[in-house]
Regions:
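A short Gly-Trp-Pro
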Residues: 1-112
Length: 112
């Protein structure tokens, strides 16, 4: 699963107009090395709990867990190097998308 999120939370997390999120089965991802800092909270707008892991040195969001996707791990799109990241296929929280950004018509789009 690869998509973009326009919620206020993702905008603040990335410092951008949206966040790029990739989701994989938890058992398909192997953490290489290093410690992370954790920020846990309840995302009221999407009604789920979230646990974010980020680099304690530079602050980059690395991955997260969402209670509404218990078998998945989310990895920030910016963590992928080069051209290895394919085009997203969906957008969520589209009601909060900035007005100057348009999306491809082939994407699935959810207002919330």
């Amino acid at each position: 699963m690869l998509g973009v999120c326009h919620c206020t939370n993702c905008k603040r997390r990335t410092g951008s107009a949206f966040g790029i999120s990739t989701y994989f089965a938890k058992d398909a991802v192997v953490r290489q090395e290093g410690d992370t800092k954790v920020y846990a909270f309840h995302h009221a707008a999407q009604n789920h709990d979230q646990e974010r892991h980020f680099c304690p040195n530079c602050g980059t969001t690395l991955y997260w867990f969402v209670s509404s996707l218990p078998d998945k791990i989310g990895i920030a799109g910016g963590c992928f190097d080069g051209e290895g990241l394919p085009e997203p296929t969906y957008a969520v929280s589209d009601a909060k998308r900035v007005s100057w950004l348009s999306l491809p018509s082939r994407w699935q789009v959810w207002a919330e």
